[in-house]
Amino acid sequence: MILNIGLIDYGMGNLHSVEQSFKRLNQSLKIISGPNDLSNCDALILPGVGSFDPAMKNLQQTNLIPELKKWVLNNKPLLGICLGLQLLFESSDEGKSKGLGLLKGTIKHLPKSEKQLIPHMGWAELNQDKECPLFKSNSSPQWMYFVHSYSAIPSDKNDIASSVNFGDEKITAVVWKKKLAACQFHPEKSGRSGELLLSNWLAWLKKETKDLY
């Protein structure tokens, strides 16, 4: 089955790395720069590198915000990556702009810790908090690559699919709600573990898409 997956380009994402990760999985991506590019897409990817306010400003300029809200409201698959996860929430301590509000909750600065440096940069082992199509039940613990200073605080803790230890606390690593998924880490920079996660998402997506036809 051939999937049509859109990669949103709003000037704040590491598009090349994401494209290359999916290319290794024999999956091409279609660049989405505006509403007219969304036709025939089965799923969307919202990447992100940088700060919250400039990201929301750039996204606003693409005229994609109403379309993204309709996309998720219609229960279509979307995958957020790093800053892309944070934009899904209502607000962020990093800026004054409103987020997309597709998930209830906010983005907070990482808690100060004598055991951890900020920004949180490097490899960390995931804790699986609930069953999620991004992870296989019999898989070994996954290590992913993080680069961030802020983390999501979902209003509904059931939205958290995976967390990671940070000092004496746990912070959000993966959210999953209906067909909306997002990860704080960079799967495209996480070697075999990241590749496996993206492969699991594609397998789930193919099943979901097949069931529609």
Curated annotation (Swiss-Prot):
Family annotation (PROSITE patterns): GATASE_TYPE_1
Domain of life according to the entry: Bacteria
Pfam short name (any one): GATase
Pathway: Amino-acid biosynthesis; L-histidine biosynthesis; L-histidine from 5-phospho-alpha-D-ribose 1-diphosphate: step 5/9
GO cellular component terms given for this protein: cytoplasm
Localization per Swiss-Prot or TrEMBL: Cytoplasm
Keyword tRNA processing: no
Keywords attached to this entry: Amino-acid biosynthesis, Cytoplasm, Glutamine amidotransferase, Histidine biosynthesis, Hydrolase, Lyase
Domain Glutamine amidotransferase type-1: 4-211
Keyword Lyase in annotation: yes
Catalysed conversion reaction: 5-[(5-phospho-1-deoxy-D-ribulos-1-ylimino)methylamino]-1-(5-phospho-beta-D-ribosyl)imidazole-4-carboxamide + L-glutamine = D-erythro-1-(imidazol-4-yl)glycerol 3-phosphate + 5-amino-1-(5-phospho-beta-D-ribosyl)imidazole-4-carboxamide + L-glutamate + H(+); L-glutamine + H2O = L-glutamate + NH4(+)
Catalytic site positions: 82, 186, 188
EC number, as in UniProt: 4.3.2.10, 3.5.1.2
GO biological process, one term: L-histidine biosynthetic process
HAMAP family registered for this protein in UniProt: HisH
Function: IGPS catalyzes the conversion of PRFAR and glutamine to IGP, AICAR and glutamate. The HisH subunit catalyzes the hydrolysis of glutamine to glutamate and ammonia as part of the synthesis of IGP and AICAR. The resulting ammonia molecule is channeled to the active site of HisF.
Subunit structure: Heterodimer of HisH and HisF.
Protein name in the entry: Imidazole glycerol phosphate synthase subunit HisH
Organism: Prochlorococcus marinus (strain SARG / CCMP1375 / SS120)
Lineage start: Bacteria, Bacillati, Cyanobacteriota, Cyanophyceae, Synechococcales
Annotated gene: hisH
